């Protein structure tokens, strides 16, 4: 995460709005942030070919070259060459990034006027841009090109991928959503995005999307009665990151954080070799959501024998990517989620609860910024027992390699699906998602956006390092430190110490 700072008062030198690209993470610059003033832009001025430039100028290039007045020829040729800077063409920098993922997943919008956005000329201040435009806080939001047209299409200077509205102005948290094969990740993300504004509101936050990627994802992966369920994410392909801003209001003040969601196919997590192209997104994650099909945990009678080892493989691969070494635990908070949990009502009674995360108002009528820990703890304990009884190896890997995790059960559809005449499954009634917001609200608690209405139980207590407690000598004369065995941290709110601490003494 990069903490973005406004310019300090009194002219003090600070890092002004440092930006880490959500696509390439500035790998070309060794991961160093770039300034908001160094962003590049996709131009609004676009000439599809040389003929269009000649039409604009009223002269052919060959006619300019044959002009006899040297001064007029130089001026005309300078104008022509300036326009050539705005020719529509393939962008080798952009294409180089997407060559790792077969092809780009960026889509055209109505605002593109039939021009593929990644073929627009990329310009920057001093090279096609005559003036930068800032907002009231001095943050660069647009640019005026050499032909007087204003563009708001900011792109990363290293990979030329689009930066959404206001990206880089506020602190950023990255969340990777990883779906083991068959877990229904695409359906889960579509339903989560569809309800995100309401889910945030129920926890006292405001949320709004800052790009087209979110609505494009929902439109391309619709979940509705009688509509075939969307296809799973193709291995080795990369969906566009999805962006939204989370606003915390406190009286007259507001704090904004940007959330970036990454869609990672579980097929890319089976081995380190498969993860090479996606490692950058996992490594830069501030939170993880791992979706597992209940069949892969032996929760149902028709267990998935072929992929029963997939959760263990994914957990081991993720640990290797994040820590890079054995013996070191991953500290990134991870929500381990059993999907399709409506199939498990008989063994998960908490899933049958109708109302989870009900908005609670304080004495002033303001919705409390909180996670419903009291409702969650019951589910967490049920989940821990079930996974221990049915997939102990998964529990062992989590305890050995992950410090901050918890169990969740979600259902993105919440109703039966029937197979149509083409052999494709579709919801048989209006989908009713259950508890799909809980993992991300738990991450919001981890990030400090909200608190819990009660202490949240860890799935397994963590033994704290020992203490050295001061024991006074006889009659209070002298004394010594006596080592006392570390206590068990049963709740997430209890901070885990890294070393032995001393208490008391002189």
Label for each model-derived stretch:
Residues 1-166:
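Long, basic/Gly/Ser/Thr-rich N-terminal segments
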Residues 25-28, 265-268, 294-298, 341-344, ...:
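Conserved nucleotide-binding/hydrolysis micro-motifs of P-loop NTPases
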Residues 164-168, 197-235:
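Flexible phosphate/Mg2+-sensing switch loops adjacent to catalytic phosphate-binding sites
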Residues 173-199:
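Glycine-rich phosphate-binding P-loop
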Residues 184-185, 375-386, 414-452:
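Conserved GTPase G-domain signal focused on the G5
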Residues 249, 253-256, 276-401:
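Conserved C-terminal guanine-recognition region of P-loop GTPase G domains, centered on the G4
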Residues 255-276:
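Switch II (G3) loop of P-loop NTPases
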Residues 397-418:
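Beta-strand-loop-alpha "switch" segments that mediate conformational coupling across diverse proteins
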């Amino acid at each position: 995460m990069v903490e973005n700072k406004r310019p300090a008062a009194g002219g003090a030198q600070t890092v002004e709005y440092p930006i880490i690209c959500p696509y390439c993470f500035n790998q070309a610059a060794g991961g160093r942030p770039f300034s908001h003033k160094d962003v590049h832009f996709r131009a609004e001025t676009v000439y599809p070919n040389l003929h269009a430039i000649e039409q604009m100028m009223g002269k052919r290039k060959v006619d300019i070259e044959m002009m006899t007045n040297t001064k007029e020829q130089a001026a005309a040729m300078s104008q022509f060459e300036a326009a050539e800077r705005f020719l529509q063409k393939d962008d080798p920098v952009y294409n180089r990034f997407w060559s790792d993922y077969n092809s780009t997943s960026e889509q055209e919008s109505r605002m593109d006027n039939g021009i593929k956005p990644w073929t627009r000329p990329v310009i920057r201040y001093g090279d096609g841009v005559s003036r930068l435009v800032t907002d009231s806080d001095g943050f660069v939001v647009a640019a005026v090109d050499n032909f007087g047209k204003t563009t708001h299409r900011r792109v990363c200077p290293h990979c030329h991928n689009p930066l959404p509205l206001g990206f880089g102005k506020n602190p950023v948290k990255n969340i990777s959503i990883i779906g083991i094969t068959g877990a229904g990740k695409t359906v889960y993300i579509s339903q989560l995005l569809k309800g995100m504004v309401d889910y945030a509101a129920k926890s006292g936050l405001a949320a709004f999307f800052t790009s087209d990627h979110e609505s494009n994802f929902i439109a391309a992966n619709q979940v509705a009665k009688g509509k075939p369920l969307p296809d799973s994410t193709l291995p080795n392909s990369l969906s566009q990151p999805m962006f939204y801003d989370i606003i915390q209001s406190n009286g007259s003040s507001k704090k904004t954080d940007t959330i970036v969601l990454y869609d990672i196919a579980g097929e890319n997590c089976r081995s380190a070799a498969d993860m090479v192209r996606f490692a950058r997104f996992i490594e830069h994650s501030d939170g993880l959501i791992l979706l597992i099909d209940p069949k892969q945990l032996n929760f149902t009678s028709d267990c998935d024998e072929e992929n029963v080892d997939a959760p263990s493989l994914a957990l081991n691969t993720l640990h290797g990517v994040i820590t890079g070494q054995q013996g070191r635990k991953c500290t990134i908070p991870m929500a381990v989620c059993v999907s399709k949990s409506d199939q498990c009502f008989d063994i998960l009674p908490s899933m049958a609860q109708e109302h989870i995360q009900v908005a609670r108002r304080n004495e002033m009528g303001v919705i409390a910024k909180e996670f419903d820990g009291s409702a969650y703890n019951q589910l967490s304990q049920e989940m821990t027992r079930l996974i221990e009884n049915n997939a102990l190896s998964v529990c062992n890997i989590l305890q050995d390699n992950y410090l901050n995790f918890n169990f969740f059960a979600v259902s993105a559809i919440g109703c039966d699906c029937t197979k149509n005449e083409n052999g494709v499954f579709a919801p048989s009634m209006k989908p009713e998602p259950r508890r799909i917001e809980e993992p991300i609200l738990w991450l919001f608690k981890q990030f400090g956006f909200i608190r819990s209405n009660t202490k949240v139980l860890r799935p397994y207590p963590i033994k704290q390092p020992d203490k050295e407690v001061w024991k006074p000598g006889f009659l209070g004369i002298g004394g010594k430190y006596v080592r006392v065995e570390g206590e068990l941290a049963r709740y997430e709110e209890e901070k885990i110490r890294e070393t032995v601490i001393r208490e008391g003494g002189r």
